[in-house]
Regions:
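N-terminal soluble domains immediately following signal/targeting peptides that reside
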Residues: 1-279, 365, 372-375, 387-391, ...
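Hydrophobic/aromatic beta-strand elements that line small-molecule binding cavities or substrate pockets
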Residues: 401-410, 444-452
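Extracytoplasmic/periplasmic C-terminal soluble domains
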Residues: 445-480
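C-terminal soluble interaction/assembly domains
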Residues: 355, 371, 395, 408-417, ...
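Juxtamembrane and targeting peptides
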Residues: 266-358
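Core segments of small alpha/beta cavity-forming domains
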Residues: 335-398
Length: 480
């Protein structure tokens, strides 16, 4: 038997709230047949949105626009559709406050599974005792963070090239309704249970290019009968996948003959000018003639054999003819200012390319082609620090573009075959989370020194004087 009850609530408000959250538990928590409530919300007498069905323990939140409230005229719903499109962009695709969103990323460094779930939904996965019925304290959030890894490792299994990789809970954040950018690290504070959302990031590290991967999600209940997931494979457009009780596993196989993302091509450096040399035989000739001339003044019988011996070593001996020594009075020419600019630019671009590699040993090996060994560790830490976005919870930015702006010579040493420049460049990097892309462009001004080491140009010092953020933007990741 079906029974319907109609209620009309009029809510006077002293202030204009940005959000309203509705919950219902008609029939109590032990009702044999769960109740369903149709919610129709009116703002200033006009319907705000389409009717929404709300089940038990399924809160529904809605944003209120007081500057452009709903109207009853016919053009309103056409404007509403355009507004909803703009709102989707503003909310970065997360348009429902009560839905669960999941994002699966295949990247060269890791496989990453990100889940954004209402707190009340999460409590149906992993029950947690609360001191207050309507709030979750910071201590209780910390307790949830300790309990979640074990639960997630049971319900989420991942294999890379046939080997099981244990899930690591990298981040756990608790969001309120006013949060737009879920990638930003949140300070923990007491949150309301009815409208809080939980963001969790699971990572599965890789050891280089891989050929196959699979992820299985095995937890489903009445509140979460499926897990709506956007999958992003490297730089390809996103595709939607639904984890269900009948289809628990998502699988990926690398296309035939593919070997995964490759490191950007290496740029060639101009050669180091050769040091001026002189034949070793010429040194013997000079020594012989000098000694012979000195001996000739005293005893010609000694001078003649000395001249003959010096001539044989210096001129007729083929071994000494092939040997050379640095010229005592000449020095190697330094590159011209345009050539110095080119050398510094190529070195800097190759240094950033080194961080396309996955393992630290490979990064170091690539860096050694552009920097002197004594400077490697400092350079590695310096560049890596610049690629980490602290506001995104320590995420590693992927370099998309290196734009060389200008350089100006400051000093040089012909004998040491070194030169110094004042340089400016810009780096554009991206980080992806929750279905959207963070792009950051930073400008740098620095003093650098380049030196010829083992007949190759190497960076031996880099001092960053200024670092400024030129541009920062966030946009939705495209789908197929």
């Amino acid at each position: 038997m079906e029974v319907g009850v109609y209620y009309y609530f009029h809510l006077p408000m002293e202030q204009q709230p940005d959000y309203l959250t509705f919950t219902q538990q008609f029939g109590g928590s032990d009702a044999p047949v769960p109740s369903v409530m149709d919610l129709i919300l009116l703002q200033k007498g006009a319907r705000l949105d389409f009717p929404v069905q709300i089940g038990p323990r399924s809160p529904h939140s809605i944003a209120l626009d007081w500057e452009n409230p709903p109207r009853n005229d016919r053009t309103y719903w056409k404007e509403r559709r355009e507004w909803m499109k703009q709102r989707r962009e503003a909310l970065l695709g997360v348009t429902s406050y009560s839905a669960t969103y999941a994002y699966l990323y295949l990247e060269p460094r890791e496989i990453r599974f990100e889940i954004l779930v209402p707190l009340l939904t999460l409590e149906t996965w992993l029950p947690l005792q609360r001191e207050e019925a309507d709030y979750l304290s910071v201590a209780e959030q910390d307790a949830m963070e300790k309990a979640l890894p074990g639960f997630l490792q049971e319900v989420c299994q991942t294999h890379i090239d046939g080997m099981e990789i244990i899930a690591q809970l990298d981040r756990l954040d608790f969001f309120t309704l006013d949060i737009r950018d879920f990638a930003k690290k949140q300070e923990r504070k007491k949150v309301g249970v009815a409208n809080a959302r939980v963001g969790m990031i699971l990572s599965f590290p890789t050891k280089g290019n891989f050929q196959s991967a699979s992820l299985e999600w095995s937890f489903f209940n009445e509140v979460t009968p499926l897990l709506n997931t956007m999958t992003y494979v490297f730089d390809q457009p996103g595709e939607r996948f639904f984890f269900t009780d009948n289809e628990r596993t998502w699988q990926w196989q690398s296309p035939k003959h593919a070997s995964g993302p490759q490191v950007s091509s290496w740029l060639s450096l101009p050669p180091v000018p050769s040091m001026p040399t002189m034949p070793l035989s010429l040194l013997f000739l000079l020594a012989a003639f000098s000694g012979g001339a000195f001996a000739l003044k005293r005893n010609w019988k000694i001078a003649v054999p000395l001249l003959v011996l010096g001539a044989w070593f210096g001129w007729w001996n083929p071994v000494w003819q092939q040997m050379v020594i640095p010229h005592p009075t000449k020095e190697a020419p330094l590159p011209t200012p345009p050539e110095q600019n080119k050398i510094a630019e190529v070195l800097l671009r190759n240094i950033y390319r080194s961080f396309d590699y996955l393992q630290d040993a490979d990064v170091y090996s690539a860096l050694s082609r552009s920097a002197d060994g004594d400077y490697l560790e400092k350079l590695y830490l310096q560049i890596k620090k610049g690629l980490i976005l602290t506001e995104q919870g320590g995420a590693h930015s992927r370099v998309r573009n290196v734009q060389w702006l200008e350089s100006e010579p400051t000093s040089h040493s012909m004998r040491a075959q070194s030169f110094s420049l004042s340089v400016k460049w810009e780096i554009t990097g991206t980080v992806e989370h929750w279905g959207h892309i963070h792009t950051r462009r930073n400008a740098y001004r620095a003093e650098l020194e380049v030196k010829a080491v083992d007949d190759e140009w190497k960076l031996v010092d880099l001092e960053v004087l200024d670092e400024d953020q030129v541009e920062s933007s966030t946009q939705l990741r495209g789908s197929a």
